Amino acid sequence: MTWRERFIDFFGLQKSIVALLFMAIFVGLGEKMAERFLPIYLLALGGGILSVGFLNGMDNLLSALYSFPGGYLSDRLGYKRALVVFNLVAMTGYLIVILFPHWLAVIIGAAFFLSWSALSLPATMTLVSRSLPLGKRTMGVSIHSLVRRIPMALGPVIGGVLIGLYGEKTGVRLAFVAAFLLGVVSLVLQQAMIEDDHKRGNAEKKPSRLWRFMSQDLRNLLVSDILIRFAEQI
């Protein structure tokens, strides 16, 4: 086994996983480059402080609500098709913000692309679990979490540069144009590199029924996670 093969095997860099990592970079870069400056953009468009507060509240709410449809569509369509749908939804929101420079249009568009990470997380974790053997799944999740930090660091810097060069209104709109184009690149990579998911079609419509399928350890983890996040927000 060559050093390249050992490297690929150690980090679990299967073809679908590599595509997922590129998607995390491209979509995440567009998301962080534009989304972080939405409050500034709202104020520049005359939305006022209340619109900024509403945007932040909507972001927290959608982060919770989007998780279930994200999981349902991932089970129903398969992770590959679900990721395509999620990207198209986000790109629709980007287009609304680009084409209609009004604070109300920004709020409407934001409903499509806010909390993309929460919406896509179930499909992402399903892809990792089905693409990698049991002994490499933790490594796959770790690499994905690490790579996601790259756009988190670079996105706001690039967005800030655009605002500095072109002003608050034009700079933010250009950031959304870049986010849309990066979404297109991500779609192309998904179709070319991610393998089809053949285990799809069965999806539970009622979240309450999922509780009885959980092991005791998973139930304990869920309860502890809820309590920790509640304490974190206090």
Write out the residue ranges for each language-model feature:
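Transmembrane alpha-helix termini and helix-breaking/packing motifs in multi-pass membrane transporters
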Residues: 40, 44, 154-173
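Residue-level signature of mid-helix packing/kink "hotspots" within the transmembrane helices
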Residues: 60-68, 152-153
